[in-house]
Amino acid sequence: MNMLHLSDRNASLAPSGGEHSLPTGGAVCRDAMDILPVILRAPVALLLLLVVLPQLSVGAEANVTVKVLSATWNWYMPRKYVTAINAGFNASLKSRNWTVAGSVNVQVVYPSNLDLMPEDFIKKQLELETDQNKIVIVYGPLGDKSVMHSIPHLMNHRVVAFGLITGSTFIRQWNPYLYFLRADPAAETLVLIRYSLCQLRVLRLGFMYLQGVHYGDEEYALTVNVMSRMGYELHGVFTVMSPDGKPAPDAEFKEVFERFATALPQAIIVFGAPVDDTAKFLMMMAVDERIARSYILSPSSVQLSLIEMWQLALEAAGASFAPGQLLFTGTNPLAKDSQYTAIKRFQEVMSEYLKAHVGETNITEADYFLTHDLEGELMVYGWISGEVLSQALSNLEWLKDRATFVRSLYDQRRYVINDIVIGDYGGTCEGDAAKHGATCECNQGSKAVYVKEMLENGQKTSVRSGFTVLKASLCYTDSSELHGPLDGLVVFMKDDDIASKAAALWQKGTSHLVGKGDLGYSDRFFLHAFNTTIAEAANDLRRDQGERIVTAVFGPVTEAMLDTPNITFIDPLELKPRLNKFRRNVIHLSPTLEQQLYVLSSYLAGAGVGNVDAVICSNEADGIADFLRSSLTEFAVSLRSAVIREDGEDVGKYLPMSGTVFVIGLSVPDVKEIARKLEERNDLRVIVLFGEFSFLYDLFATALNNTAGAARLVFATSLPHWGDTETSSKTAQLFHDVEKDSRLWTPLSVLAFATGRLMRVILLHVEEMSPETLVNFFYTDSSIVSDDMRYGVFDDTKCVDTANKLSKNGCASNYGATQISVWSMARALNASIPPLTNPMTPSMTFRNSNAGRISGASLVGIIIGGALALFLVVALGVVPYFFLRNTVITICTKDDRPVTLIFTDIESSTALWAAHPEVMPDAVATHHRLIRTLISKYECYEVKTVGDSFMIASKSPFAAVQLAQELQLCFLHHDWGTNAIDESYQQFEQQRAEDDSDYTPPTARLDPKVYSRLWNGLRVRVGIHTGLCDIRRDEVTKGYDYYGRTSNMAARTESVANGGQVLMTHAAYMSLSAEERQQIDVTALGDVPLRGVPKPVEMYRLNAVPGRTFSVLRLELELLNDDEDQTTTSCSDHSSSRTDLSVAAQTIAASLQSLLGTFTPAQRQKALIPFCERWRVPLPQKVGNVWDDDGCQEVVRRVAAKVGRVMDFGTRKPSSSVTSWKGVEVSSQVEERLL
């Protein structure tokens, strides 16, 4: 890529006077000769002469004149705008004295008559050129028709048009003679949609365009497509047929307009060509009260005509201009946008030019471009065109002839003008250049689009939130880059300083994560300040919801706001402490009041505290006191007193002289009083809630900094330390990377940042976004991981209340904070001070406080008896057993934490049993032994086996991955004592290749030496998934089983893998830490459809044995298994009776029924289970634990159907390469289809 920088107007170019600013060739030679020994000077001089003479001959011919034909005008463009765009172009070249690269002279030819069409001017001038190698460039033209009519002339004379301006997408095609500098109309269309939905947040967006004028048709189709994909639709479309600008019939026009206005669009994207029907539309809009104040959003190509039309419409309607109602996209900054370095340089150059060329421009003010925004914007575009042209002419070798010059323009070119970037440009590529990053057949120019709003008196201002940059790696605009937005509100309550300050900190914390215009998934999260008062907050929110898109509310809220339907509240910070109520649309990420009290009670018990006091100021003081008492009682701590304090009462009079006191419900004056009491009373410990602590953090930090009392102010949090620069927390590291101001390292800022990171994680997984979509994600995924923060379990299931559930809502859970630890204020101020407790995720379950009360004597007896029993256990050697099982119990009994499940299965096991009945018993026994050794090594839990399939649980995702990887390596290096298994696998592949011409055997045709390094013995496929499970204890086996979506997903993952392959879901992969992910080698497989799973699942392949290759995933094979259950280790509700049995299957069924007819159901059950396990026949769920006659009959039919299919295939394939065993001929293809 040629990176041509122009940070100074004369960089690499000749300054005034025409002399090079760098040392001349003669000076360099003299300096070099001076340092050489005398004996070497003559040979070196001769060598230099031989090198320089050819260059001097080239230089003698190097004075080149490049002619530029200025075609930047059109019939609908007022003369002042033509002057502006040409003045900017001239200013760039004049700053170089019309000379580039020291010897390239630029000569600009202007039309003598602007009544002439640009295409005619171009044609006439090119026909006058007799030397077809002389470089001629066209500056312009403007407008789609002029460009289209000019193309034949440009191509005939091999001349390139620079800086042309078009309005429609259809003309932005690959043509090496059209050199676009601006972003294309499709990009501007996407930005108009983005701004409407993400910044204006309009609920109803309309679209206006005319048919028959070759403008707006493609942009309308693009808008409909993009809106639909995002889950939106247009509210009102105005379009009439205006062929070549002729007006549509009046009656038809009015009828269409009435339908359009009835839809009440709040904003209208107007692709109105500069013709009468566009002016008529605006006239009617200006007088229609329904839409007169709707936003008008238009692309840059029609802004000049549209502004004039709208002003005339307002005058006719007697209406005043509304600043901000008219919005336009633009492809370059305004002339007054001095935040850009390039614009600062433009301002200097432009001022100098205007001072010196008053006669040519009729502009007397040197800063005219600062006070006339429309003309100034065009001057900037002209100046950029001149800068690009100067760089394009900067090498004499490129100017040898027209063909060479055209090729040079597409030699992977990019133009950097300070902080404005134009390009990449590329021509026709060879071979796989495009795959390696080359830009091919691209003439499209800038990727930046700006949004500007019209103010009064023709002034404009840039809207920073509208600035958008499309992917530079893509030549043409990709509409899939625009995704449905998450429009969030942060509530500023102007009558509460503390709440407003908290909202400001919250917004600042997420400011680094909201959309910045880098189109893609990182540009989907948007936050808007919502100003209100405490009293009116709920009503104002409902009004805003009726007028604007509101996906979610973040930060401080009032209790009344939480009752607003159809809005999701993400981690709301209530102004007053309240107990959590299950509202499905309210998602708590921070510890709830209940969770905090539970964790703090546990801490107090561990600290040896026997009783505590509480001072509570809240409308729910009684309920809070009851919950605090229950939490303390759970941990054998007593609540000695609970005082209910009125709002405004002095907290100091309620604080005890010593001991521990919960202070719930804080106000600003309370901070100093608590700090004073802590300083005075060395034995006093004060516990506060995290939400209130975060609201008042600055006050607490000021009052307790460098005091002993800081160690005795206590709270609970799930956050990493906001001020720890040596932290291992990924969240905190990322926060510090983007927020350099340490004054903003506060609890609220890092809380907001963590929440923003979570929103980004969610947005990666959903295309459409709405309040319902957002809240459903939490309850569907249950547990969500973002960096090092884990949230969940979220559960909206309504369960039956049980005695040990304190929550009145049964199982429903809308809170998800995990890993909550207890801190002191001293730690908050100094990260090197450790937390008071290790992190814990509270179970939130309580024992019955009235049950089990015993007397002191009984308690002594129990203690003595327990001690004797423990002695006997130790003596009998049971302790080691329980020690070894400790990990198992930890894994199996906690269903509030994600678990990683591993499913394994031997590839083609049925076929192997049929082919090698003498080998497989020992092979399967070895298979079981090796896997169980690994289960023990990695402290996992063997849930169950069915035949040769294992289901394994692990509390550590990394341990699960290590187990799967070592499993493959163990099987590879094990001495199986026979080659029969490998030979069979190769035969299976060869047979399949014969039957399927599209199939390529991955191992059958490998060189034996290569094969031995990659494959050996049984091939086991493995699937890994992480998530929450319903864990149940089997009272018969005394083991644990895992149910739910996680086990099904893990089984489905295994079922699509090939033998020797390890697949892991995105959830499993992302459950690994960043450090753990670096230790494994994976290949991303993209989204994989799984049977029974609504959406494709992102999948990764663990490269356990480097060099192994596999067939495509077994997706079609799984689909053929529709009569089986969702897991290989569970029952099924599908019945074989739902399909007709083949003749072979009927024979088998009849034989089994005859053999088992005299058995009791229990005996038949015992006899049939081995057949089911060996043939992988899932059991119907309806049979239960004890089979009746109908259940036995159903199982017989299932076994018969499975074996019958194998026999039928064997009959059709008598030449199978697999040996016959006991009358059943098995082929690898049947095995693959069945298993």
Swiss-Prot record:
Segments traversing the membrane? 33-53, 859-879
Q: Which residues bind Mg(2+)?
A: 905, 948
> Source species, please?
Trypanosoma brucei brucei
InterPro entries annotated for this entry?
A: A/G_cyclase, Adenylyl/Guanylyl_Cyclase_3/4, Nucleotide_cyclase, Peripla_BP_I
Record bears the keyword ATP-binding: yes
Q: What is this protein called?
A: Receptor-type adenylate cyclase ESAG 4
| Cofactor binding note | Binds 1 Mg(2+) ion per subunit.
SUPFAM superfamilies named in the record = Nucleotide cyclase, Periplasmic binding protein-like I
Q: How does it sit in the membrane?
A: Multi-pass membrane protein
